[in-house]
């Protein structure tokens, strides 16, 4: 019974984590990205990391938000204010979210890459 409760709790936590719309492809991918890049944004929780990624993804381009569409329906954005970079699929599934070391130059290089 305890194992069933744990499994249901994990399932519910995953549902709540991704309830606001598409997040990463799956929980494992999300956990890996958070472990690798979460500290770049300060001492933030996984929920906050996902919220920031979704916010940048959903913010219209213009002003400090740069956007480039790539082949295969991949969209990249860069926020000049925070230095954050995101890449996501046409269905809004997040591929990556982090702060590149060379900021806007990274975004511009990625925009020119074929895929």
Please give the residue ranges for each predicted region.
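Eukaryotic low-complexity, non-globular regulatory regions
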Residues: 1-16
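A short, surface-exposed interaction/processing loop segment used at functional sites
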Residues: 86-115
């Amino acid at each position: 019974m305890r194992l069933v409760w744990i499994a249901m709790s994990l399932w519910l936590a995953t549902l709540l984590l991704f309830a606001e719309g598409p997040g990463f492809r799956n929980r494992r991918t999300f956990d890996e990205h958070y472990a690798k890049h979460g500290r770049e944004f300060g001492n933030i929780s996984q929920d906050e990391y996902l919220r920031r990624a979704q916010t940048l993804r959903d913010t219209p381009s213009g002003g400090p938000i740069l956007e480039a569409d790539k082949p295969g329906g991949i969209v990249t954005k860069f926020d000049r204010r925070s230095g954050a970079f995101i890449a996501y699929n046409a269905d809004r599934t997040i591929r990556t979210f982090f702060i590149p070391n060379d900021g806007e130059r990274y975004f511009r290089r990625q925009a020119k890459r074929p895929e």
